[in-house]
Design a protein with these regions (language model features):
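Secretory targeting and sorting signals
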Residues: 1-33
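Secondary-structure junction/capping motif
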Residues: 6, 41-44, 481, 491-492
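Short amphipathic alpha-helical segments, especially helix-boundary/capping motifs
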Residues: 21-22, 41, 143-145, 430-435
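Extended non-catalytic accessory segments flanking core domains
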Residues: 33-298, 302, 306-318, 349-351, ...
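Divalent cation-coordinating acidic motifs and surrounding scaffolds
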Residues: 105, 184-185, 189-192, 214, ...
């Protein structure tokens, strides 16, 4: 959890004492009856929590009584503990648990009376500073409340803040972006979460929010030496499942978060795919966003030569795994052909070493634009032959102009025209007017992407057997994709990939397809298959090439987390 002790007032930190240990489970019930506390409480915990998001007693000093349910007092933890009333009130709107920011030594099942000031800390109701913690006996362990997501009647989690919970049913790993940095993982009830604008059923924003839960590690350490859920070197992937999640519900940095009292175990439900699913055909075409392949250090890609070598090794492994005849690339450094040549040279060296028989060349971009990154084609000179020269567009709607190149099987056959693209991103920097976020789920610059799609549709209409591919920064049910489909182009991933597997990117825990392969009518009849190779979006980012913060033992020169986008692959029957 991102909770910094340094952000605490000095007086509060001065009041903290020695730390206690991490709870590894809920203690068994004890038969001994607790003695009466000498100092009575003057408020119930439910009164402190109130019926809303914030405490009605904020700023006041109160004295509450309860039983310790979780102890996270170490300096690398939350520097406090959770207390819960063993006799809850009858109001379902109020919580009967609360966080106590104090390192006064306590243990789970201690019956305590705590005196402290009620504050809202990043949205969490807690007692801080604490002037007294009186331990007055040992109580029966508080049994966790059983809950299931989504909650009934659209109820929120506020009523469970500070309460010991057990989540019933299976939960699916849906986001690991901050697993390596903060020890956080997002899970969801009922399966993977999808972008509402990607055309999946039951994926509205409200439904997604009701099904998701952030699981924290009860720690304030950033970039911990030991990353959760990496036992025996096996790293959790999105789609893996857990059950019986148990812990105390906290809140911070805009999210409810479960602080586990029992370490979750994730079962492998989404095995790593060593190679793409077969797509058939005599020519295979791939689309791959390289996530800023730069030979220039310290720009968008690698910061050091060592990182650049690590990135290159992973990119080569991914390209060799795709085993494609033509590959459309995105986010290649726009520094002439320097970065592109370095990638192709490394790919050919690896191919020669293994005797794969492939020798790749690249297509020069006639007008790559002025952006720091560009699109590119690499192709196997033994299996396909370029037909005519490369073309592009000087339409100022493009920040990164497309690249158009026709290819024919080297042994003879039908030609097709590949059009590789990288549309304007969804980031909102500088967006105004129609490019501003319209609140329709398509984020910023959708109007620009619609214009880009229309321009590409015109290029495709004039091309022989067009295949539009690349990172279109648009999910499958958004306006730009509709423009292309209305122009007669057909999504081959929608056609061949099962709905639950149709995603290439994960953002804020939501899976969706930003990368696309769309074929013209005649070429679509020659498509033998399509797949999305999930080697990147399901993997945590601490597996990538970066050396800062990423534990060295997890790096492998393989395809997994070679980028943040999954590559796409289609098969064509052209002979």
């Amino acid at each position: 959890m991102r909770r910094s002790a340094a952000a605490r007032p000095a007086a509060v930190l001065a009041a903290a004492a020695v730390t206690a240990g991490l709870v590894t489970g809920v203690a068994p019930a004890a038969a001994a009856a607790p003695a009466a506390c000498a100092v009575p409480a003057d408020h119930e915990i439910a009164d402190v929590q109130g019926t809303g998001d914030a405490s009605p007693l904020a700023g006041r000093t109160v004295r509450v009584e309860g039983v310790v349910t979780a102890d996270f007092q170490r300096s690398d933890q939350l520097r406090g503990f959770f207390v819960q009333d063993p006799t809850p009130d009858d109001d379902p709107r109020t919580s009967d648990g609360i966080f106590v920011y104090s390192t006064r030594e306590v243990n789970v099942r201690d019956r305590v009376v705590v005196t402290g000031k009620v504050v809202e800390y990043h949205g969490l109701t807690e007692l801080s500073p604490v002037s007294a913690v009186d331990v007055c006996g040992t109580a029966r362990a508080i049994a966790p409340d059983n809950v299931r997501l989504p909650l009934e009647d659209g109820a929120g989690l506020e009523r469970f803040e500070g309460v010991l919970l057990r989540f019933r049913g299976q939960m699916v790993a849906s986001e690991t972006y901050d697993l390596g940095r903060y020890g956080e993982i997002t899970v969801a009830a009922g399966g993977r979460l999808y972008q509402p604008t990607d055309g999946h059923d039951d994926s509205s924003q409200a439904e997604n929010e009701a099904r998701r839960l952030l699981v924290d590690d009860a720690s304030n350490v950033q970039n911990p030496d030991t990353i959760p859920y990496t036992a025996d070197g096996r790293v959790v992937r999105l789609g893996d499942v857990t059950a019986g999640l148990t812990g105390v519900l906290s809140y911070g940095f805009g999210s409810y978060r479960l602080q586990p009292t029992r370490s979750p175990h994730f079962a492998r439900a989404n095995p790593r795919p060593d190679k793409p699913r077969p797509v058939g055909g005599d020519v295979r075409v791939a689309s791959f966003n390289t996530l800023n392949w730069f030979t220039t250090l310290g720009r968008r890609g690698a910061d050091t030569a060592a990182e650049r070598d690590r990135q290159l090794a992973k990119l080569v492994a991914a390209l060799r795994g795709l085993d494609a005849d033509v590959v459309g690339l995105m986010e290649v450094e726009n520094n002439g052909d320097t970065a592109l040549k370095a990638l192709v040279d490394a790919l050919n060296a690896a191919s020669a070493e293994t005797g794969s028989g492939r020798t790749y060349a690249w297509t020069a971009h006639p007008y790559p634009g002025t952006d720091e990154i560009k699109v590119a084609f690499v192709y196997d000179t033994a299996t396909v032959t370029p037909v005519g020269g490369p073309r592009s567009s000087r339409d100022d709607v493009f920040d990164r102009p497309p690249l158009v190149q026709a290819f024919r099987p080297a042994a003879g056959g039908t030609a097709f025209t590949a059009i590789v693209n990288h549309f304007k991103s969804k980031g909102c920097g500088g967006a105004s007017g129609p490019d501003a976020d319209q609140g329709d789920g398509q984020s910023c610059y959708n109007a620009r992407r619609v214009k880009q799609a229309a321009a590409i549709a015109e290029l495709a209409a004039a091309a022989e057997n067009p295949l539009v591919l690349g990172d279109l920064n648009s999910y499958a049910a958004e306006d730009p994709i509709e423009v292309l489909e209305d122009a007669g182009l057909t999504s081959q991933t929608k056609r061949f990939v099962d709905d639950e597997d149709r995603y290439s990117y994960v953002y804020m825990g939501l899976s969706g397809e930003l990368d696309h392969m769309l074929a013209g009518p005649a070429l679509a009849r020659r498509v033998t298959g399509a797949t999305i190779w999930h080697v990147n979006s399901d993997e945590p980012r601490f597996l990538d090439y970066n050396t800062e913060y990423n534990p060295a033992e997890f790096y492998r020169p393989d395809a997994f987390r070679s980028s943040d986008h999954d590559p796409l692959l289609v098969g064509l029957d052209l002979r």
